């Protein structure tokens, strides 16, 4: 019986190079290919795939991957049924844990979370953000960061043109 192949999810994007460096320091050589999400790794029992960090927890939960590197924020956001094996403290710019913050301009009238009651909050982590404000009994409307209504290019006529 052949040895099973371990399916590993590596983050693409800003954590891609720091993750490859981390594996390099551990003795695994990961070699990326242009326009290909399946880098080579110098271990015949491992196959790697570059994935969005947001998707890695769900890919593990669904059995597409056996393990992967992602943030606890995305495990919490996706509510994926996975086991966190280890905390790896690294990022694209430091060796400190990443953190999500509520940011406003210094001269903003909003200086504490309660000041945002009834406002729209744009975030990548809608579930985490909603839960944060709900735990504090602050009613807000969360939306995906960058989401905008699609512009209407035409006006629907009340009578279809084919009648």
Language model features with spans:
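Domain-level signature for soluble enzymes in the chorismate/prephenate branch of the shikimate pathway
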Residues: 1-163
């Amino acid at each position: 019986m052949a040895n099973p192949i371990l399916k590993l999810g590596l983050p693409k994007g800003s954590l891609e190079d720091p993750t490859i460096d981390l594996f390099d320091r551990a003795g695994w050589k990961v070699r990326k290919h242009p326009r290909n999400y399946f880098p080579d790794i110098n271990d015949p029992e491992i196959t790697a795939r570059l994935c969005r960090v947001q998707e890695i927890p769900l890919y593990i939960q669904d059995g597409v991957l056996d393990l992967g590197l992602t943030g606890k924020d995305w495990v919490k956001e996706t509510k994926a049924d996975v086991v966190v094996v280890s905390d790896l403290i690294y990022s694209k710019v430091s060796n400190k844990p990443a953190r999500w913050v509520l940011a406003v301009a210094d001269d903003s009238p909003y200086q504490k979370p309660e000041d945002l009651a009834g406002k729209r909050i744009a975030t990548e982590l809608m579930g985490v953000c909603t839960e944060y404000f709900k735990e504090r009994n602050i009613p807000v409307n969360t939306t995906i960061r960058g989401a905008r209504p699609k512009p209407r290019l035409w006006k629907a006529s009340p009578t279809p043109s084919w009648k």
